[in-house]
């Protein structure tokens, strides 16, 4: 990853130090309770002999300490009996995923490279990236739902990494736990300081967006369970209006998401004609634009108060003409919508360039005059490859040639 003193800092958290190699006779790590929902916490208690009417109370206690207080040790749970704390510590842990790398951008954006254990002995562990984007009035955490991605969107860096597997609900929730740990975003913790952090309100992580690595609707069951845990008012307490699921257009799951879960919806659109979208977002060949837009018009959770966000990356000479803007306006008729125009963020090896600002502003003005909010998303975290479309979980740093190429691309956009 590119890092220069004036643009970014790179830090490895104390708990992120590489674990020593385990010998053949070394005990396996204890299973962690982090990220589990109430049913799974109940099952964990049942396994150590906590049953009957007592179990529900104990689940509520664990929920409070894990998700509201951010406990990292069972010893912190002072209203839980010493005997039960000992039993819990003997069978389980409160371990978070390993932080392999933490980077802080010059604009305050933070990116964590997180490592989950291998699924089977002898296999490689799984690395994913999570990004925190602070603003004065909010802090948005961009979480991943898959290790890699299968969509192969031509403008997206994640699409160059093969899909390994879906993340579990616990692994999705654990990303939020890590971010709140590192930011001190729990009662009684020392809050993080630095450029760009929210100055309003009492929370640093206020919003969650499923816009990291992977297609969330291909990991539907995990995403649904994770949202229920994240939105529980007795714990992390992130209301569903503060949780956005972004999809490239898995049409059959869009209605299901609205009916069963009801978060905010974002669509990675990026083109208004099937021929171009087939190239940019290949899933369009399976679910073309007409089918996608019909799913949006009937999305159960959509309303004027809960508009669907359409994401549109601005690619120089590809999809940024005034005719494209007018076609976008026509396409959105009948949909409660807003449009996020995203300046393309460069990454090594890409064939695309970002539209110039005059072109972006002209495009935005056409959409705005038609009655749609059309903010231009300010690029955040470009210097640490944390911006939209730049995530990729490989832990190896960029080669010198790739760093020079990236610097050149960024310089051209300034």
Curated annotation (Swiss-Prot):
Low complexity biased stretches: 1-20
Active-site residues (renumbered): 129, 388
GO MF annotation, one: rRNA (adenine(2503)-C2-)-methyltransferase activity
A biological process from GO: tRNA methylation
Cystine pairings recorded for this chain: 142-388
Keywords for this protein: 4Fe-4S, Cytoplasm, Disulfide bond, Iron, Iron-sulfur, Metal-binding, Methyltransferase, rRNA processing, S-adenosyl-L-methionine, Transferase, tRNA processing
Radical SAM core domain ranges (all copies): 135-385
Cofactor: [4Fe-4S] cluster
Residues annotated for [4Fe-4S] cluster binding in this entry: 149, 153, 156
Keyword DNA damage applies: no
Entry keyword annotation includes Zinc: no
Cofactor info, note text: Binds 1 [4Fe-4S] cluster. The cluster is coordinated with 3 cysteines and an exchangeable S-adenosyl-L-methionine.
Reaction(s) this enzyme catalyzes, per UniProt: adenosine(2503) in 23S rRNA + 2 reduced [2Fe-2S]-[ferredoxin] + 2 S-adenosyl-L-methionine = 2-methyladenosine(2503) in 23S rRNA + 5'-deoxyadenosine + L-methionine + 2 oxidized [2Fe-2S]-[ferredoxin] + S-adenosyl-L-homocysteine; adenosine(37) in tRNA + 2 reduced [2Fe-2S]-[ferredoxin] + 2 S-adenosyl-L-methionine = 2-methyladenosine(37) in tRNA + 5'-deoxyadenosine + L-methionine + 2 oxidized [2Fe-2S]-[ferredoxin] + S-adenosyl-L-homocysteine
GO cellular component terms, A-Z: cytoplasm
Domain of life the protein comes from: Bacteria
HAMAP family: RNA_methyltr_RlmN (MF_01849)
Family under the similarity heading: Belongs to the radical SAM superfamily. RlmN family.
Note: Reaction proceeds by a ping-pong mechanism involving intermediate methylation of a conserved cysteine residue.
Role summary: Specifically methylates position 2 of adenine 2503 in 23S rRNA and position 2 of adenine 37 in tRNAs. m2A2503 modification seems to play a crucial role in the proofreading step occurring at the peptidyl transferase center and thus would serve to optimize ribosomal fidelity.
Record's protein name: Dual-specificity RNA methyltransferase RlmN
Species this protein is from: Xanthobacter autotrophicus (strain ATCC BAA-1158 / Py2)
